[in-house]
């Protein structure tokens, strides 16, 4: 049952939020369990939560897939709807429980804009109230860090470049509307959906530029999606340190952002069984610049999918934090921004971090030569792809067995068409009057553009999900006719 048909808060405050996010964020209100010099190692775990928006409600209304699961309990694993809902709110129970036991728990939370809107649509005050507590309560701020993302779980490499910033901004609008500007000001880390990092020079440069302009200070990346400047993979020790991800576009311009490295592949058991904690317990400080810093194991997993996350994670989370409380021996839980802030306070900034780049850049820039131009880059990519079929500039993610581009022309071409139509209609108007983004027709068209870019319409193969995409595309085009 949809309780509200109100559109999501995805636009209208662009300049205001950009200005807000250039302010310095207040640090965590609670000190870590140990001073930096006493920390031997640490781990940072993130939970990724997402439910897509689909045109499957009454008369084709846009509803959360969580709502669809509740309405159709006999299909597939839809009987898990309420267990999923519990997963979306349970950290508001687990964190205070462990604090009460004398533990110092930490968790990072990555909620898609779709899901935040969906639980609002559904009137699930149990979930929104729990998230508001985690985002706004002064005590929780030292234990819980929210990560930003794209609003509709788009994957960056196949998202039209002009829409990267729209996706980032829409999520910030949604989060601020639900939890307030002060809570948004604390969101400084970014979790790209599917850990999908673009490796096309212009896409990556635009992505990192949009993140930096939007106030993000660091990015979570998958270890196999990046390389060192010489093309070599990251060393094991390097994966346990912050790195400096440099993006260079086809004109030779460069921009950088701090990257924390998610190791290994897509396996919810890694977080579900708190493997990062037990890995960190066996690690020591590592050299960085002229000093040493705590090794940091960084990991993310779906927060609700699968029996391990639904059933085993809560007790594993408790056991790990009790173990640290009783016999941590210099190993603690930290959140990403907290770890980087401690390094910064100790005089260790990103100039000391190892420099990395997106995978494939070394081969590309060697082929381009010393005078990069868009034409030279395009020609070099074509030569490399012809000589080596495994060379690709789509990007890289934790699901390299799945292509987000190949075989989905019937989704990607309409998506590019809708994006082009949207920008042709509204960009000239926005140049004249930025407040046009407050208009209902702008926001309705933007909503359909963002929704069409949802990865789920490509993840599950041809059929119902691509039909959903077709419906959203048709409605979006009609709005722009």
What are the roles of these predicted feature ranges?
Residues 2-86, 114, 236-267, 275-279, ...:
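Active-site and substrate-binding clefts of carbohydrate-active enzymes
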Residues 40-47, 52-160, 183-192, 217-222:
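Short, well-structured secondary-structure segments
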Residues 55, 87-94, 100-103, 111, ...:
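Extended, H/D-rich, highly charged conserved domains that either
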Residues 78-95, 123-134, 164-169, 202-207, ...:
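Well-ordered, non-membrane alpha-helical segments in soluble/globular domains
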Residues 87-98, 167-175, 445, 472, ...:
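Alpha-helical packing segments of well-folded alpha/beta enzyme cores
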Residues 127-145, 168-173, 207-227, 237-251, ...:
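Acidic, His- and aromatic-enriched active-site or binding-groove loops in soluble protein domains
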Residues 164-194, 250, 284-299:
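CE4/NodB-like, metal-dependent polysaccharide N-deacetylase domain
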Residues 171-172, 179-235, 305-328:
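Catalytic domains of cell-wall/extracellular-matrix polysaccharide-remodeling enzymes
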